[in-house]
């Protein structure tokens, strides 16, 4: 498979996961959640918007352990860029199951 096709396939997989995450968050929270469509730009503010004062980063990695370690750190800088109080990462697991992943500090911020 050529490199361009591989990158496009990964982007499509990520876009689909972001749409799924936005739909799920809308359903469970009652907030109108949407994709930001601004991934990778300087001053990135996360993948999903709609939950007040919260930044959401989405990951759909084959290696979910890597996603659980990497994404909570990345979303923290996005939280700062957005000047939001809260940040969380949503990781898609095989079979379409989702988990919200936080650092201990991010979890504590939710408790305050």
Stretch-by-stretch model annotation:
Residues 1-112:
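Catalytic phosphate/metal-binding cores of nucleic-acid and nucleotide-processing enzymes, i.e., regions
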């Amino acid at each position: 498979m050529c490199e361009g096709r591989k990158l496009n396939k990964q982007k499509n997989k990520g876009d689909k996961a972001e749409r799924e995450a936005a739909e799920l968050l809308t359903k469970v929270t009652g907030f109108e959640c949407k994709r930001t469509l601004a991934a990778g730009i300087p001053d990135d503010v996360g993948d999903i918007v709609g939950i007040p004062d919260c930044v959401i980063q989405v990951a759909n990695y084959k290696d979910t352990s890597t996603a659980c370690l990497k994404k909570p750190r990345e979303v923290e800088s996005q939280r700062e860029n957005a000047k939001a109080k809260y940040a969380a990462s949503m990781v898609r697991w095989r079979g379409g199951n989702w988990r919200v992943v936080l650092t201990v500090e991010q979890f504590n911020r939710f408790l305050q």
